[in-house]
From Swiss-Prot:
UniProt keywords, alphabetically: Cell inner membrane, Cell membrane, Cytoplasm, GTP-binding, Hydrolase, Membrane, Nucleotide-binding, Receptor
Family recorded in the similarity comment: Belongs to the GTP-binding SRP family. FtsY subfamily.
Cellular-component GO terms for this entry: cytoplasm; plasma membrane
Gene behind this protein: ftsY
Any one GO molecular function term: signal recognition particle binding
Protein name: Signal recognition particle receptor FtsY
Binding positions (GTP): 283-290, 365-369, 429-432
Enzyme Commission designation: 3.6.5.4
Membrane topology: Peripheral membrane protein
Amino acid sequence: MALGFIKKVFSFGKDKAETEERPQEDAALERGNENASFEAALSDAEAHDAVDKDPVSELEMETAGGPAADEAVDVAPAEDDEEEDAPLLPGAELSGDMGLVPLSLLQAEAAAEEQGEPLPEPLDAGLDADAMDALLNEAEAASAVESPAIPPVLPKGFSSAREREEPVPVAPQVKLTWFQRLRAGLARTSSQLTTQISALFTKRKLDEDTLDELEDLLIQSDLGVETAMRITGALSSERYGKDVSGEDVARIMAGEITKVLKPVAKPLELDLSHKPHVILVVGVNGTGKTTTIGKLAAKLSGSGLKVMLAAGDTFRAAAIEQLKIWADRTGSEFIGTKLGADAAGLAYDAYEQARAQKSDVLIIDTAGRLQNKTELMAELEKIVRVLGKLDPDAPHTVLQTLDATTGQNAMNQVEIFRNVAGVSGLIMTKLDGTARGGILVAIAAKHKLPVYFIGVGEGVEDLEPFEAEDFAKAIAGV
């Protein structure tokens, strides 16, 4: 193949048809002896005399090796290139001196010519640098789009995590009204009452036996003996000897409970002529004293009053920190002490600072204590005495928090704390759980203490003024 190429280089004037009529056997023979004949032909070409001494025609001289390095070559316009005959070797005019063309390129061109297949035109022929960059960028972009990412093969002992599924967007929950949240909190008491009452009066007329059974049901629901007797008495006077439905009982029950609760549903009065107005918050462990104080502070400071919070629960570090967070959140002043310090001494310091800073309201937290712990109840008495020495009317308000889930135990708590600390009002908390809210009716009927607020959640807006009629309807399921 190489030998045939060398012959072509030095025989440009000969008829091209002669090379095409060569037998295929000679071509195959030449290809078989390619390695041996090529080296010999190359040696002969290198040993050949200079080009200017060869007996070649002027036309061969002009086309064999290209222009000399020191001679200018006129480039014909692009339109004339199409009319001229194509050079014998494609790309020869771009390669400069034939002696500088790599041997591999010469071999490839000669082999392609022998097989009758034209070599493809070089991609960079006639393209400037910008066009070439554009082509390369398009090729890279196409390969990036078309070639899918092949995940790596992990070694033994490893596994690929599954693709995480996109979370399904959760539709925002519709915020319940206050009455809806109250009804949900009292659902336990209400559902038990309505179910049992409906079963009691199925296909029965109202008589003494059914009245006694109804009274037992009401007492078991923590409504208290007094309230149960009021309900059965009102029902007897209206429907005795007649058929009674569950709706009739619920309507009468809601009305009687409202009558019991209305006298105690009062707003919390603040005497701002006393600066500060001192509110002492008491209660057993876990009734939500600290959270209730934070909610009260949010309401008062939101109304423009200057509030100070005192961390009187010196037995729990968490209580001190929690009250500090509420103070920061509500923009209230805060005073605390070290863990285990005297709570009465803290109350004294808190009152002095509140008076010096002209605070409108001072709310003092206290440690949770069981009503049967004599020493803790004595400490509570000491706090009340110390505040009384600073101001004969202090504490001006003593609030007791009640857990709505405790049932009858709340009745005993009110009685003892009222005797020790002089409780002046109640706040019922945790009505958002499995509440047994009927006990509030029994406490109101017995102690006649004002019920200022009830809580149905952890948020500030979940502490609302007590409304007797709403509470009664929620219990009765009306």
